[in-house]
Amino acid sequence: MKFIKRKTKLLTITIGAVAVSSILLGGIFYGTSQKSPSSFGIASIDQKENFINKDNLDYQKARPSIKDSNLKEIPKPKPQPKPKPQPTPFPDPIPTPPKKEELKKPDIKPEEPKKPEIKPEPKPEPIPQPAPPIETKPKEELLPPNPPPPKEEPKPEPNPQPQPQQVPNNSNSRIIEINGVRVEAEVEVPPPRDIAEYDKQNNLVNPNPYINDSVGKIKNVKVTDELRKATGKLVQGNLGRWDYKHLINDLLTLKPEEIEKYVKNDKSGYYAKVWYRFSRLFESENVVNFLTEQGKKEYPEMKSKFVSKDHKYAWLYQHLDLTKFTQLSNESESYLKEGYTPDPDNAYVDENGKISSHAYSPAKGYNSVTSRMENDNWNRRVFGYKSWYGRTPGNLVEGNYPGWKKTNVTQEFHQYGVSDGDGITVNKLTREKTEDGRLNEGYVIDIDADNPQGYEKTKKLIQTLKEKNINITGYRIHNMGKSDSSQKFVDILKTLPNQLPLLELFFSAGSHNTSSLIALKDKKIKELGLFTLGNSLLDEWSINPNALRNVEWINSNDYNVSFNYKQGADIATRITFDTLAFDESDYNDNASDIKSKLKQINDGLRMVYWTRNNEPIFQGSFGPGLDPDHKESGNSYPQGLDFSRVPQIRSLRGLIFKDEQKTSNNKDRKLRRINFYNNSTTYKMSIEDLNEAGFNEHIVSGEPGEKSKITFSNGSGTTKIQIDGDQELSANGISNLSAMFNFAESLQRTIVVNNTNSPLANQLRNAGYSVESTTNAGLIDI
């Protein structure tokens, strides 16, 4: 019995030891297993589907199972914001390929080729004369050809004040042509332009209403394989230009060790431009896939023989199979859906051999800039032609037009007083191919104002031709102010017919006096050209907008400003007006209140700043915004005011710089330059002039660019301010006074006040100014 109990006891101890050992070993194994964290899970039996029908699941921590219940989706990367498409800048002239003989022995220290910049805007630089010809729109298009404008120029967004008016968004589907391929597209049609009733009643609108952007905006394109292929082929041709091939073949005739030095001595940067377009691919192992069969065979051995980057790039380019560049980058594909094509001159090949670009061209027929210029040339010019090009400097001076024949018929006008040597020439212009319903011939009289005989007889000649009903299409007056900047032209311009198709005035480079234009105020002119052979961009060029109220088109197409012209050469071009000027006749001295006194001037400001601000001539130096016909606040405008011919105006008091008729234009215009009349050392102002001067409110301050300035007609001769009145200045008045001293550099911190106004004198002295008192006897220190 004892034996049985003892045996039972031993078995119990043995079984217990085995159980404890098993538990300990299992725990140790579980704890040391690398997969233990993921080997435990809780699953519930429910009515959900067994499988998740998605292709972005994370299988890294998956368990064997008949269900996808515990699988997580891989988060999708956030798409990078797509940059705004930039209109194609007008291409720079292709540099003349360098001659090998000239570059082998350079006289000038080599320059490191510059990396091409990504082309934007605008800028705000003037737009050079375009080069590519405009194409004819397809018959199916409902609108005249044209895409979005260049430059937008970078215009500040309006401050959110009143809610902008909603412009109707009219879209329709149509067939358009892109790169020779007809595709379906959705196009937004521009709505009509709203004209305020005030502008109509006060003769501020263009007699022949002007539309800046008459083409639609492409919203979406149905991209086809045919379109992709045509787009790729367009860029291929530019990547494989004959001049590229010719220059690089010549480069490879040199010894490999000479190539790098030769390229560095290329002052035109021609090779650097070629390298830049392919460098991403050339630095990628992917390049072998885009070589010719011969290139693929030789490349492995050549890799160790390249002695410089230039040697490598030249060899790779020579062995490229350009027909393999058929795919567009994701960016190019995205822009193509919006109707933009990679601009061939700005295109490059990425590391994957796909075509991308720094600039994209709008579809044919949807370039708002070229369409505007073409429409102006055809419908606004008196001697119109079908092209978007402006006239060259030579044709501008000579009065030539594409598609027109010019014949000298001066002898036929001898009977009216014209004689040889008086600087007066008469030409007959005849259209080479007649157009029904349009002007096909006309007579133009050229007058040289620098010729004393011609200048003296001009007025009489115009009067005689008017009396005899001789139909003259246009007058062109040259060298205005060349011999004498104060030369009088008001009487000559007043004598012109009240209705005149064409008037072109050429101002001397040394004279910026345009005050005679006020004589055109009541004349109806179809085309007015204001030109110079000097610097057309100077701030001194000013114009009185009230003189242009009845002009249908001020020529803005004949713009010939470019760094490519020889410095100092006489280049005829239209003038850019960034300053508005007014005359004493614009100020109503007989009115009883300031608003009525300034009505003509404020109407002139409104005409330029808002009503006709969609016209290029009234956009100052920087051009249109994104929607020039409907969002005028986004357009540029003249930033200078010249009151040197209006002595009554002493500050900006009473002047209106906001759009009082259209609440969506909720950003006031601001100034960078103001010129006031003065003829002594002391500039006189009233208390009201200073309290309501608006200098802080309407003058640009603290922004990039040249500092704003206030000047006087007598230059630095103005050194003091005299404040007339028997009151103190308000807080605004003190602030405006401080701004005036800040912007007017000729002023010293000396202020003259009436000797009876001690409170004002003390107020100014406490503000840190030197104060002098005046009586009828003169100045006395106090």
From Swiss-Prot:
Extract the NCBIfam families matched here: mycoplas_M_dom, predic_Ig_block
The answer to whether the entry has keyword Membrane is: yes
Localization:
Membrane
**Source organism phylogeny:** Bacteria, Bacillati, Mycoplasmatota, Mycoplasmoidales, Mycoplasmoidaceae
Q: Which organism is it from?
A: Ureaplasma parvum serovar 3 (strain ATCC 700970)
Composition bias of kind Pro residues appears in 77-97, 125-135
Identification of the protein by name: Uncharacterized protein UU044
Looking up InterPro entries in the UniProt record yields: Mycoplas_M_dom, Predic_Ig_block
Report the domain of life of the source organism.
Answer: Bacteria
Q: According to its UniProt record, which protein family does this protein belong to?
A: To U.parvum UU046.
Give the stretches traversing the membrane: 10-30
Q: How does it sit in the membrane?
A: Single-pass membrane protein
- Region annotation Disordered: where it falls in the sequence: 57-171
Q: Does the keyword Oxidoreductase apply?
A: no
Its chief place of residence is membrane
Give the keywords, sorted: Membrane, Transmembrane, Transmembrane helix
- Spans of biased composition, class Basic and acidic residues? 57-76, 98-124
| Gene Ontology CC terms | membrane
